[in-house]
């Protein structure tokens, strides 16, 4: 990791110590074991939820390889540290982990930690999350703040059109990319929002301004959709 990325990571962590923290563990089911993996995740979520950790299980869709995300949410850095320590000494978790390790339903392919850019958001604010789309942006050197400001403008437009928006800066497991997450009540709601976006003069003007920039603040590197199949809050 080069020095500029390391500095950005440390800056994000220290400046957002009172913001919601999310941990995402991305799993690829073994052939014929998707149901087992989901069952194991639900058992894990029950253990974690009893500790006070909010958990979502998300099935990824278009733009992904159909993996399953196990998502843990914490109110802030203090809660993250406290609950991680609790998990480390949990007999229930240790016993469950040993059982799953002996007969896994899938393999962990990625894990990442993210920090919400909105300090007012709490871990239990995602109880009604159903369908989402994610846009991962890689900021140009020195342009992270410009990207964050662009996110704020886009979020204001999108929320006026009916979507909920959250944005995250990558922490441990990532570099300095940022994730723009749009949340909807259903797939039909997603379609309705997209239709409104296609005729929104404000959104089209914002897009055109970004497209015309000779030195864009960031590059879009990944997009995908998904839906929450289980929520433990």
Predicted stretch roles:
Residues 1-4:
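Positively charged n-region of N-terminal signal peptides that target proteins for export
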Residues 6-9:
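Sec-dependent N-terminal signal peptides
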Residues 14-16:
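N-terminal signal peptide c-region/cleavage motif recognized by signal peptidases
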Residues 18-233:
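Short S/T/G/P-rich N-terminal loop/turn motif that feeds into the first structured element of a domain
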């Amino acid at each position: 990791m080069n020095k500029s990325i390391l500095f950005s990571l440390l800056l994000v962590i220290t400046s957002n110590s009172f913001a919601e923290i999310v941990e995402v563990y991305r799993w690829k089911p073994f052939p014929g074991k998707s149901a087992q993996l989901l069952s194991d995740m639900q058992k894990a979520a029950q253990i974690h939820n009893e500790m006070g950790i909010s958990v979502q299980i998300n099935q990824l869709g278009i733009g992904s390889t159909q993996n399953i995300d196990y998502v843990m949410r914490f109110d802030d850095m203090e809660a993250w540290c406290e609950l991680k320590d609790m998990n480390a000494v949990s007999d229930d978790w240790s016993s469950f982990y040993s059982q799953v390790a002996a007969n896994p339903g899938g393999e962990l392919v990625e894990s990442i930690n993210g920090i919400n850019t909105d300090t007012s958001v709490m871990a239990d604010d995602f109880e009604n999350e159903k369908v989402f789309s994610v846009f991962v942006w890689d900021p140009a050197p020195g342009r992270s703040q410009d990207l964050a400001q662009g996110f704020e403008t886009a979020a204001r437009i999108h929320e006026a059109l009916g979507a909920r928006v959250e944005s995250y800066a990558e922490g441990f497991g990532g570099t300095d990319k940022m994730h723009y997450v749009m949340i909807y009540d259903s797939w039909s709601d997603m379609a309705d929002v997209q239709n409104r976006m296609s005729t929104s003069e404000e959104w089209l003007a914002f897009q055109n301004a970004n497209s015309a920039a000779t030195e864009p603040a960031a590059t879009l590197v990944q997009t995908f959709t998904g839906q929450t199949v289980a929520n433990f809050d």
